[in-house]
Structures are given as structure tokens and as C-alpha cells.
Amino acid sequence: MAVTNVAELNALVERVKKAQREYASFTQEQVDKIFRAAALAAADARIPLAKMAVAESGMGIVEDKVIKNHFASEYIYNAYKDEKTCGVLSEDDTFGTITIAEPIGIICGIVPTTNPTSTAIFKSLISLKTRNAIIFSPHPRAKDATNKAADIVLQAAIAAGAPKDLIGWIDQPSVELSNALMHHPDINLILATGGPGMVKAAYSSGKPAIGVGAGNTPVVIDETADIKRAVASVLMSKTFDNGVICASEQSVVVVDSVYDAVRERFATHGGYLLQGKELKAVQDVILKNGALNAAIVGQPAYKIAELAGFSVPENTKILIGAVTVVDESEPFAHEKLSPTLAMYRAKDFEDAVEKAEKLVAMGGIGHTSCLYTDQDNQPARVSYFGQKMKTARILINTPASQGGIGDLYNFKLAPSLTLGCGSWGGNSISENVGPKHLINKKTVAKRAENMLWHKLPKSIYFRRGSLPIALDEVITDGHKRALIVTDRFLFNNGYADQITSVLKAAGVETEVFFEVEADPTLSIVRKGAELANSFKPDVIIALGGGSPMDAAKIMWVMYEHPETHFEELALRFMDIRKRIYKFPKMGVKAKMIAVTTTSGTGSEVTPFAVVTDDATGQKYPLADYALTPDMAIVDANLVMDMPKSLCAFGGLDAVTHAMEAYVSVLASEFSDGQALQALKLLKEYLPASYHEGSKNPVARERVHSAATIAGIAFANAFLGVCHSMAHKLGSQFHIPHGLANALLICNVIRYNANDNPTKQTAFSQYDRPQARRRYAEIADHLGLSAPGDRTAAKIEKLLAWLETLKAELGIPKSIREAGVQEADFLANVDKLSEDAFDDQCTGANPRYPLISELKQILLDTYYGRDYVEGETAAKKEAAPAKAEKKAKKSA
């Protein structure tokens, strides 16, 4: 049934739609059979179709159109015959993905008059390969040739098993019918090849479209080029089908030193160099009313000369205009789609490229450009040209007409007769169109678990008296200069001497930086880094509790990489392996050894450090495995004289480390054992270590080991909101870190122990709320629960043990009792809550917090209240008044 009006077009679309639905269920084997049969038929009809195209359009050369038809069938088939376009394209068992191809549906194919049969063959074949249907809107000047090509492909496809209406066309094309087709609700994609107006209409249709831009290919010929090859290539390309290929050369820009030689070569091999009036006459005929004169498109050189009012030999290949102006006022500077060529002289290579840039920008941006040079010995020029040209195809030593369509002069450039020009040319793609552009890809993504890890220092030495023996490794490793980082108390009380005496006896030079204070600041860290830069140690030894170790770690970074910006070190991350800022490689200048003199922080084995910006008072927890010390020395002799308050705060810090690591979303079977063992040791030995001190060296040693074991657990499983809030409390009110954790931990447990939280933290391994169950497991492991206890009872017993332990260790019952003034706290609680939410530790908490929830935990902890889910401060304040009112009423 012929299509000559909108009603007939609608009927055609309905038939094609039905055919495509059926075709969408075909297997790859069925599709490939149809694809092959259609390609064979098109190749077999290459000559009659070429004759028909030239006869109807009055453009081009039969013999060249034969080549284009052959290319559109044979090369397209060869390139894509083995490409999977149906069903499952790929499966990745490692990452759990399946990629599935789906056809787009019905394609509207816009075909130009310059390539009426080859483009129809090409678009039909790639549509068949991808289980799509296609309806052609041919150019009126070549409609019969286009539709005949489509029909030949269709009949071959039907014979091979395809539905009968899979390919359709408009018999009497018009602007009205083209627009109706492009805007039809059942059209799923427009594949447009044609003039700028038609391509713009496609993109303006509101439909997904793949269109191509105009070409205005410039050619640069430099002084290293093979001139004979360059001229031969340009002539072959420019005369191919009388220049109608949109990639064909429109201008040559020749470096001055070889300009005359190139000009002479053109003149002696078929090029006609226009002079005087002839040049002006051709300039006048190229453009008509400011646009390309359709009368010259696809015509031989001698006919164009006749149109201009003079004659040239019939064997003239191209008309060459030697011009100087590179702007729209020069007709030769435009796309001409005919065997006419502009020739420019450039003073040098850079000038030639600059002229080529202007020519591309003037009318062929995004399409094609070409360079003739010594590609083997001029890689810098190839690179320079590639960077300067805003074209999707940058051809080197290649005839542009044949090279641009791919697979002829470079076998990685995809064969195509629809050449995308990217955003420069107003196109959606910047490559040669192929089957991959005509399928929708669905990705089935199975849930996968993140790779986890368990990272430790290379060596951990422990037991009483291990310090001097462990230091032997420093000597045997050949270290010559050691910087000890500590605080003034430890320095004045001879702790540093225990290290320097061993090292000096072995001939190791030592320097001590002892200005670290509690909550180390950036200014102190920078001062230590300056000392390191002048002393140039090959080993840095951190001696002390968390503060000296934190300071030493950051000094280490600044010493090894002075170019490092602290603001980047402190940047938050969601996944430590995917962070935007990558810590630099450490250990190039110096190794890091951590010797702990407190039992709590675990910093000797962790990738964490906390530093305070003294300009703002902001505390920054830093995290990266580059900060993990190379060696940790855990010698309990160094903590025998630790004061009771430090024992209590450090011990409860370690308890919190183990608790948070065990319920973290990153907890694993590797970290779980260490968290539980640390808690077991702390439950058994922390009270005795606190009360008896050095009189019970076993208890002190077990707590010291437990703190490091808990450090290993949270170094790998990370922490949670208890630490997030503790960091901010410590920074704002100068509450010791361990005390801040002790004040918060019970309410954090109450907050986390919820099987239906407001928000669950998103992490693949953490597939459901588990904190409640895991707190109960801790109670079981510590022997707190009785047989038959339910989860809630176990958690209450865990909380009761913690409250008893805190009371025994002299911990205040609230933040207010710890000395923070109410007005000061309330003035800062909103900022504390927001800053805690933004803390690096928050991301691993099992319950993803709302800022308002963190505020409630802080308020409840300040006043010594138990956190209760869903109860706000306002409700809690109103409860006593309500109870009193009720009591009066009943009385």
C-alpha cells in the first residue's frame, strides 16, 4: 500500500509496529540469518541501485555509488555479523551483573539525496541487526531509489523469516509527511542523515534522535608530508562520487615551504587552478542567496565551470581556488559537496592549524579534519593537531571521503554512513553510528558485598619489658636517625630516655620533640614537622597516648609530603577505598613506630588520627590506612604508674571502641573476635587495674593488651556515633575523650538497639538492622545473660553492667555533672549535633542518624536521662507537669 498522505502513514506505522513487536522476540540466530540474507541482497543489487540513484538525483558517479552500496552491505555485515544484539549480551559473575539488549522499537530513517541508496541499505541493515523496524522518509529528489533499496532489503529479510512489514517508506515524501513521521507517537528514535535543516527538525521533534552535522573538512599539509601521496589522496577523495560525501575535503591549507610543490602537483594531476575572472565566476556560483547552490552538488568539475561561464577539459578532476580569506565572506571556505577545493597558504605548521580551526568552526565543527605529515616521526604534530581540532574524526594521511566512513584506511574506525559530530555539531553522539546506538541496554545488578579487609601494623610487640627488645628491629633495619615525638610530662619523667638510651648505644642519632599537648593542634603539628624537615629522620617514634601518636602521624605526613594540604587530608569519605582525596604513599623517608603509654586509644594500631584546628577549635578525625604505624610496641611496664582517672577514661574508651566495632556496618568475622575478646578482658581486668594499679601488674597488662586488641577491631570495622559526638564534646567543652565516650555510650546503645530505625545505614553487607541482636550477643559473650533471656532483657543487663562499671570507675552520671554549664551546652547543642552528623565516624554506625536524633541523645545525656525512642525534649519536659496535673485531678 502506497503512503502518500497522513492517514496512509498512520496505517503503515500500525503495520510496522505489529511487525516489530513480533521481531523483538527473535533469537540472535534468527536475526543473524536475516541480517546476512539482507546484506547479500543489497550487495547483489549494488549496480542497478547505483544507476537508479544517479539517474533520479542527477548527482554523483555510478561507479562510485556502486562502491558505496557495496560498502554499506559488505563492510557493515562484516563488521557486525558476530556482534551480540539480542538477549543477554554479557554476564559478569564476579561483579554480579547481566547486560540485556532490547530493541528501541520503530526508527524514523531520514535519507539524503546525496547518498540515497547506500544510506538506506546501511540504516536498514543495522535496524535489522538490532531487532528494530524502520520507516524511511526519503528525499523527494531520490525517493524511488531510496525506497527501492529499502524494498530489496525487506524482501530478502522476509524470505529469511522476518515479519513482512518490518521496513516501510513514504512513497510521496513531503515536509508534512516527514514531520508527521518524526512526531508520530509510535516512533521511538529518529536516525537522521541529511542537511542541517532536516537534522535540526529531527532534534526538535521531541523524540530521541541521532543526527549528523554538516562537514567542512580542512586538510593541513606540512613540510614533512609525502606530497605525492597527499595530493593523490585528496584528488581520489574529492572526486569520489563528485564530492557529495560529507566528510570530503573542502580546503587544503599548505605550509609555505611546500606550497608551490603541492600546487604544482595538483596542477599536473587533474587539478584546475582558477585564475582571475574564472576564480570570481566560480565563487559566484558556489553560493546562491547565502547558501550552497544545489545546482553544483554532485556535478563534475567541467559542468560547474560551464555554470560559471567558462570551459575546462572534461577530464578535469577538481576546480581549485587559491584564496586567502578564512571567513563566511569567502565562498570557497564553505562546504561545497562538489569537486571544488579551496587552497590556502600558511606561514608555518601552527598557522596552518589555526586556519584549519577557523574553517572547522565556520561550518563543519564536529565532523572531520585531516593532516598530512610524517606520522612516524612527527608524533608531536599529530598530537597537537588532534588537540586543536574540534572534530570527531581526525584523519592522518587519509583520503577523507573514504577514511571518514571507517574500516577502509583505519580498521578500528567503525564503518558507517551516518557520522556523528558530537555536541559541537549539535549531535547526540561523536562517533560513527552503528548497531550499539540502536539498542537499549538493561543491566541486571545482583546484590554484591563489598570487599572487606583486615589491616594491621607489620609488627606488634607486646608483653612487659618488650620495649628495648623491640627497638632492636630499628637497629637491625639500619635506621640511623630517630625522631621521638612525645609530650612534656613523659619527657620530663624519663620515658623518652628509655628509647633514646637504647638507640644511642647502637649509634643511632636521636632528636626529641616533646611539645605535644592534649588534643594536639595544627600549629604544634607544623612545628614538629619543621623539626623533622631539619633533622631528617629515617624513623619516627611516637611515644605516649593518643595525642602524641596522633600528632606524630600527621607530622609524618607533612614531613614525607610537605606539599600536602591539611584540608584535603580531613575531607570526609563514604568509602575509604573510593575517597576523592588519596593519601600519598608513606614510608619513603621514614618508618613510623608507635609506643603506647596509655591503655585506651588503640592509636598504635589504627589508621586514624585526631587533630584540632586552633584557628577554629574544630576537631578533625583523619582516616587512611597510610597512617597505620609500621610497628606497634605494647609494653605494659609503661602504664604501671598511670593515674586512676586516665585508667578509667582510657579503659572505657577501649570498651566503646570494641562495642562500636562489633555493631558497625563494616564489622566482619575477623574484627568480631577481637572486639569480643577485648570486651572480655576489659570486663575481667579493668576494675582491678583501676583500683590496684601497679600492685596488680597482670590486670594492668591485660587492660593494656585489650585496648590494643580493641584498636585492631575498630581499625578495620570503624566506629559510630558515640565517637562522633564525643569528638565534638571534647572539642567544645574540653572533656577528655574517654570520659565523653563513657558519658554517651549507654544512650547510644539505646538509640542503636532498634530493629525498625528511622533510617538504616546503607552498606551492602548490612542487609537489615542487626545492632539489637549484636548487643545481645555481647551480653551473652560477657556472661551477663541467663538462659531464656530475651533480646531486650540481655540489652538491659548489658546496660546495667556498663552503668555499674562507670560508677565504679568514678564516671559522672551526666554531661552536666562533668562540669558543663547548662546555658553553654544549650547554646551549642545544635551545632554539636550537626558537626557530629558530619563526623567521619558516623558513616559506619548501624543506624543512620538524623541530626535531630543526635541532638536528643546529647540532651538526654546532658541531663542524665535515658534515651527513649520517639521522645523529644519537649515531651520529656512536659511529662512531669502532666503527671502532676493528673494527680491533682484524681485527688
Regions found by a protein language model. Name each.
Residues V3, I121, V199-D327:
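ALDH superfamily catalytic-core signature
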Residues D260, T268, V605-A717:
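Carboxylate- and glycine-rich phosphate/diphosphate-binding segment that chelates Mg2+/Mn2+
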Residues N78, K84, A149, S523-N637:
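Glycine/threonine-rich beta-strand-loop-alpha-helix active-site module
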Residues A24, F310-N450:
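Conserved C-terminal structural/oligomerization subdomain of aldehyde/semialdehyde dehydrogenase
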